[in-house]
Amino acid sequence: MLKKITIKNISSIGECTIDFKKNKYAFLEENVLEDCVNPVAIYGHNGSGKTSLFRAIKGLILLLGYNVNALSPFPVNQFEFNKAGAKNKEAGIGSISLCFETLGHAYEYFLSTSRDNDIPLERLVCDASLLFEYQEGKLIYKGKPYPLGNNVSKLIPGLRILAQREIDDEILVSAYSFLSQFAFVDLPMQNSQNGYMYSSTLGNLSTGELLFSKSKEVKEILRGYDDFPLYSIQKNEASPSALSNSPQYSLCFEGMEGESLPLSLMSEGMKNSSLMLSLLLSLKEGSCLFVDELDLALHPSAIRSFLDVVRKKKVQLLFSSHNTNALQTLRPDQVYFAKWEKGYSSCHRLSDIYPNIRQINNIEKMYLGNVFEIGGKE
């Protein structure tokens, strides 16, 4: 269970903390998962810094599980770097800290990277005891220096190295396994040739294969959606005489048996809904899903249905959105507002900035009316 994320000096962020721990509200208990709230939403005007937070998560996913030859450090806040000057090392360092629990252990993981393409400091604490520390190329594991060997990239986290070498260390491997189950969907980049879904556990699964693998389950979920066509994805087995341009996957609608369309003709709305549900269903219970601008993929009514599936699946979800309709289903401790001011972004929890808010209050109406006085620059 992810408990807290703290990000410092990454992209537009000065410092930002997202706390998943529930407050003492006595309503909407369906949004409570153990001692945390789920999902958690981030709102804010364009340019408020919401995307910076998700790009930090993306950077973590890449560092922990992707091709070592393509790793890059967290991009630091350019305003801070320019103000401090290139000689100030701290201004060139970005970091992320995570508190989480898994398999009965409480962890604190800290990872920083620098513009010099190295890791100034990384550490993993388990149950208040230091398991390892990686600082300026020197790795201390269980209190002893750990040999890294030659030709090890300075940007490969120590956690990644140790989890692959010390496979019998269940405490360490459990921490790495938990963080490796993070998945990020960068919806503003959904038309990018480089892809927009990031998850080391899903590997190189193609869009078609992902849709096909969860087609039956998605179809049953869609039965609960209002006015949504029911369909399934079928995989076409190629024959020796098949044309090279024959579609590999087909779209089949319920009630129109015997007829199908190439998957390429599937509408963007249908594809986005199916992809989000297929990805969610592919994640293990207890995994974490991060989605930037969820409303780019889902209709307002579909977002609420999607959040219902998130609750039932028991996957933690952190998302940003401009669709305020979802606010009607969230508690004050589930909502954060991003704010950009003088070059720095931060996030503010509604239950902190407006502690007297109650169930009777209309959060959506208050937000649209600028009652909270929180938001970024347009």
What feature does the model see in each segment?
Residues 35, 39-41, 54-108, 114-116:
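Conserved P-loop NTP-binding catalytic core
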Residues 1-62:
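Pre-Walker A-like glycine/lysine-rich segment at the N-terminus of P-loop NTPase domains
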Residues 38-47, 236-281, 288, 294-301:
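Conserved ABC ATPase signature
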Residues 1-4, 304-378:
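C-terminal lobe/lid and adjacent interdomain/linker elements of RecA-like ASCE P-loop ATPase modules
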